[in-house]
Swiss-Prot record:
This protein's name: Proline-rich 28 kDa antigen homolog
Keywords on record: Signal
Source organism of the structure: Mycobacterium leprae (strain TN)
Lineage per the UniProt record: Bacteria, Bacillati, Actinomycetota, Actinomycetes, Mycobacteriales
Signal peptide: 1-28
Pfam family, one: Lpp-LpqN
Length: 278
């Protein structure tokens, strides 16, 4: 395992934390799109959904993903040599979750803790009012941050989990299962999804809504399979709010989703493209 003098970094509003060797930085607001299906009333300081970049239209996306998906690249017009060629086959959707896939491959998942963790550099922005909280309801939590001053019965939160993956497998094959655990949530509706690499690593991100305890929740969930030397890690981030708070909380959730980073201490990863702003 590659060792580094760098420690896990958390971005926050100009504060300094010394517990567990956490370094805190000031971070600006980026953008994601955990947005509700219907546009709510305008809120001061938050741009309306009309400011989103044009949504790309695709004709066939596997796995039950919406056909209006701004994560999918614009299809290129076929050149003269491509005309008349048969269309490419669409891969059949997978039914196993990532954890089911790893179990079938006899891959051992070893939960990691932030204290002394040096295999990867992980950046998790902490917006204003959000704080790191202990949460026994999150199995194997690496970090949990939440807005405990919000107005909703549901506390907006972000959960980070990191596992060392012990065993042999193909990360590109594994990440094809990245949507399944989220799609199995009650009354799940997808709004955006992508399996593009993230910081140079195989990754999946899916966003949408689901039902839990009588509430509709809006969530963004990303899996990253990161390498550090010969070792591989599953880094999973979920950012969730009540649907009724999705627009009001957008500056905070956007900052978390777009400011999140994963890199190997010895490899300079490319900066991924920003998601559309609200």
């Amino acid at each position: 395992m590659i060792q580094s003098t760098q420690t896990w970094r958390v971005l926050a509003g100009g504060l300094a934390a010394t517990a567990m060797g956490v370094t805190v930085f000031a971070g600006g607001t980026a953008a994601a799109d955990p947005s509700p299906p219907a546009p709510p009333p305008a809120i001061p300081g938050v741009l309306p959904p009309a400011s989103l970049p044009p949504i790309q239209s695709v004709t066939a996306v596997p796995g039950g993903i919406t056909t209006n998906n701004r994560f999918v690249a614009t299809p290129q017009a076929p050149g003269p040599a491509a005309l008349g060629q048969p269309p490419l086959a669409v891969a059949a959707p997978v039914s196993e979750s990532l954890h089911d896939y790893f179990k079938a491959k006899n891959i051992k998942l070893v939960a990691q803790k932030p204290h002394g963790f040096k295999a990867l550099d992980i950046t998790l922005p902490v917006p204003t009012r959000w704080t790191q909280v202990p949460d026994p309801n999150v199995p194997d939590a690496f970090a949990v941050i939440a807005d405990r001053l919000g107005n909703s019965l549901y506390t907006s939160n972000a959960q980070l989990v990191v596992y060392n993956l012990v065993g042999n497998f193909d990360p590109k094959e594994a990440i094809t299962h990245g949507f399944v655990d989220t799609q199995q949530l009650s009354a799940w509706q997808t709004t955006n999804a992508s399996k593009a690499d993230f910081d140079g690593f195989p990754s999946s991100i899916i966003e949408g809504t689901y039902r839990e305890n009588g509430m509709t929740l809006n969530t963004s969930r990303r899996h990253v399979i990161a390498s550090s030397g010969p070792d591989k890690y599953l880094v999973s981030l979920s950012v969730t709010t009540a649907l009724s708070q999705a627009v009001a909380d957008a500056p905070a959730t956007n900052a978390i989703v777009n400011g999140f980073r994963v890199s190997s201490p010895t490899v300079s990863a490319p900066v991924p493209p920003q998601l559309g702003t609200r």
